[in-house]
Amino acid sequence: MKYAILCSLLWLTHSIATPLSLSDEVFQEAQHILQTQQESHYDHKTVINESKGYYRVDCSSFVCHVLRKKSPLALAMLPIDVHHVHARAQNFYDYFKQLESVPNAHWMAVKTLFDLERGDIIAWKYDLSSHKKDTGHVVIVAEKPIQEEQTLYRIRVIDASKGKHANDTRAKESDGIGSGDMWFRVNEKGAPIGLYWSSKEKKERQHFIVMGRVQH
């Protein structure tokens, strides 16, 4: 009995003494917004009223809002395009790509998909030939990747989007902030090279994909 009590006290002491990592704080903030939002919409014009739980955001303004609350220094490192007020998906991509060769104190590159942790950020950039209006997409990792095939992993993400993922929390006719499952294809080095937005039965999308982790 005394041994069991001692073990419980040691575990409690360890839990109190071990603070959350910054990336885990990013996840917790995104999860808090997901659970407490009253209304959200996907829009490139950002309007946020936290007291009312109202969010009108796109994928990048949502992630920037989370970073602003948890790591404004890391957010300040991200480049911003001319005539824009926050980093967009392509800026996340370009910055994370640069991290692979030039790391810094605020961010680190995550080079292999199976090393992702909660709160890490995945960004991909659309090829200019696709003629898409958006520059790409950016999501926050909600759960560690689960391997389903030799080169295919399922990941639960939190994002702001128009389209829904598999097992999505967004209502049928709604968009905005939600959580759902995506699948990512990796190469022989474990780096992501393709994705399935909502179903493995649909065509795999090939994009330039990178990953980053906030550290300070």
Give the location of each predicted region.
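Short amphipathic alpha-helical segments that mediate assembly, nucleic-acid/protein binding
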Residues: 2-3, 205
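Sec-dependent N-terminal signal peptides
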Residues: 3-13
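N-terminal capping segments
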Residues: 17-85, 204-216
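Acidic Ser/Thr/Pro-rich low-complexity disordered segments
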Residues: 72-94, 165-183
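...with weaker cross-activation on analogous glycine-rich loops/strands in unrelated enzymes
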Residues: 80-165
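Low-complexity, Gly/Ser/Thr/Pro-rich intrinsically disordered linker/tail segments
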Residues: 160-216
